Amino acid sequence: MESRGKILMERYELGRLLGKGTFGKVHYARNLESNQSVAIKMMDKQQILKVGLSEQIRREITTMRLVAHKNIVQLHEVMATRNKIYFVMEYVKGGELFEKVAKRGKLTEVVAHKYFQQLISAVDYCHSRGVYHRDLKPENLLLDENENLKVSDFGLSALSESKRQDGLLHTTCGTPAYVAPEVISKIGYDGAKSDIWSCGVILFVLVAGYLPFQGPNLMEMYRKIQHGEFRCPGWFSRKLQKLLYKIMDPNPSTRISIQKIKESTWFRKGPEENRILKERTLNENTTKNVAPVLGVRRKKNAHEDVKPMSVTNLNAFEIISFSKGFDLSGMFIVKEWRNEARFTSDKSASTIISKLEDVAKALNLRVRKKDNGVVKMQGRKEGRNGVLQFDIEIFEVTTSYHIIEMKQTSGDSLEYRQLLEEGIRPALKDIVLA
């Protein structure tokens, strides 16, 4: 049914695969009656039910029907069969804004200004309808054939009716590098204020080519986010810097509002003419091999000298999250290319360590605890590529909220992933946030 050229429900001719995620895939398609090009997102019903995504899907449909804006990807219709759910959406042929940034290294302030105005217009519209996106990032921003911005992926959106009696949202969603400090803290938060923060991170990334908050691990990155620790590079205009510091204010009560953003000089007028010439020169001199968004880190005390380096791509997770955990919906995020896995838990550190020891015993693994919060596990016999070893590091965000990272250090990668999938993952299900 889903192969190229096949007819779907006597209405659409399916074409090439546009993308694939954890819970579905997107195909290009053509409406047989109108000849209109569309994108069809296909999701498996059984998988949705299995991982408890049915409420998430209902929310996405409701949200997309509430919003109709020129800078938001439109939902045309929803269809279903016994086994599948189909979202028929507007086809946006220009690709992801993320790809444009990754290819160029960074954008000029002039170009970023245009996209930011369109982003704020779309977000402001959503907020006026009681809808908060909660996962704004360059990968969720598409470009049409005229280079106009389109906001997509309302899978994490929260309606205003989702608020508790205190008027605040209480679920932790979004991609870690773009999420607001109050969301990380797991306290109630204003969905509009958290979206504004994410817009600020996006604007920074567009003009800088790298993230404002970076660290050797998630805990350090979260610390910087919570304290609003970032510096603007020298090529940012003063008015842009001033606006960014107001947007990425770690205190949501003093953070700038969308209305005030619209009234700011940089938003209304854009960068000054003399800065435009400077930015064009900088852009022309940017090498084609500049590392994309997260492949760059600033030197200490020399933030203008940016060099590419390989770091964990924290903003490329395939995340669909609406649980207490950041990015898992009760499951692991496994990054095969780095042989890493990550999950969250609301258990105490001692409970987590005790559980890990039980799992190691059941799987016939040796355990050695370290003083710096790292638990090392290793196999008891040689594998295909030596003895399998991996480190487990526990980060405390709050006393009742921990992030656990697992990294392979030696042995066969295939054996490691098999152990994760068949042994560790199911054994830890009772401590992973659901």
Swiss-Prot record:
Domain NAF: from-to ranges: 298-333
Gene3D superfamilies: Kinase associated domain 1, KA1 (3.30.310.80), Phosphorylase Kinase, domain 1 (3.30.200.20), Transferase(Phosphotransferase) domain 1 (1.10.510.10)
Entry cofactors: Mn(2+)
UniProt: ATP binding residues: L18, G19, K20, G21, T22, F23, G24, K25, V26, K41
Biological process, per Gene Ontology: signal transduction
Residue numbers spanned by region Activation loop: 153-182
A GO molecular-function annotation: ATP binding
Active site: D135
Task of the protein: Involved in salt stress tolerance. CIPK serine-threonine protein kinases interact with CBL proteins. Binding of a CBL protein to the regulatory NAF domain of CIPK protein lead to the activation of the kinase in a calcium-dependent manner.
This protein's domain notes: The activation loop within the kinase domain is the target of phosphorylation/activation by upstream protein kinases. The PPI motif mediates the interaction with the ABI (abscisic acid-insensitive) phosphatases.
Protein name, UniProt field: CBL-interacting protein kinase 15
Protein species of origin: Oryza sativa subsp. japonica
Gene name of the encoded protein: CIPK15
